[in-house]
């Protein structure tokens, strides 16, 4: 199922705040599942599971080394969320 009518986004949670004309126009994003592409919603970069409930929290690629911040919860194995803090 795609995001905001975009069929190429894999399994993502959809848009919570409406869509302004395409995959990259979501105002808010629901939680992503593994396989969601970065063009679904502007909050995400790369693919990871359980990320992106708001545009402020960004999905980063695969390891905590790409975050550039230390983590409070046993970082890091396969997923990484980053902006001001990293949470695995």
UniProtKB/Swiss-Prot annotation:
Q: Which GO terms describe its cellular component?
A: intermediate filament
Keywords (alphabetical) are: Keratin, Repeat
Q: Using the UniProt annotation, give all residue ranges assigned to the region (10 X 2 AA repeats of CG).
A: 4-72
Task: Write out the similarity annotation.
Answer: Belongs to the KRTAP type 28 family.
Remarks, miscellaneous: Human have a similar number of genes as other primates despite the relative hairlessness of humans.
What is the purpose of this protein? In the hair cortex, hair keratin intermediate filaments are embedded in an interfilamentous matrix, consisting of hair keratin-associated proteins (KRTAP), which are essential for the formation of a rigid and resistant hair shaft through their extensive disulfide bond cross-linking with abundant cysteine residues of hair keratins. The matrix proteins include the high-sulfur and high-glycine-tyrosine keratins.
Q: What is this protein called?
A: Small cysteine and glycine repeat-containing protein 1
Its source organism is Homo sapiens (Human)
Q: What is the lineage of its organism?
A: Eukaryota, Metazoa, Chordata, Craniata, Vertebrata
């Amino acid at each position: 199922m795609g995001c905001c009518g975009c069929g190429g986004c894999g399994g993502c949670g959809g848009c919570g705040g409406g869509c302004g004309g395409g995959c990259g126009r979501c105002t808010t994003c629901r939680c992503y599942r593994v396989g969601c592409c970065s063009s679904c919603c502007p909050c995400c970069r790369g693919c990871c599971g359980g990320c992106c409930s708001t545009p402020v929290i960004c999905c980063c690629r695969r390891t905590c080394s790409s975050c550039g911040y230390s983590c409070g919860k046993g970082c890091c194995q396969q997923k990484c969320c980053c902006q001001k803090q990293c949470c695995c």
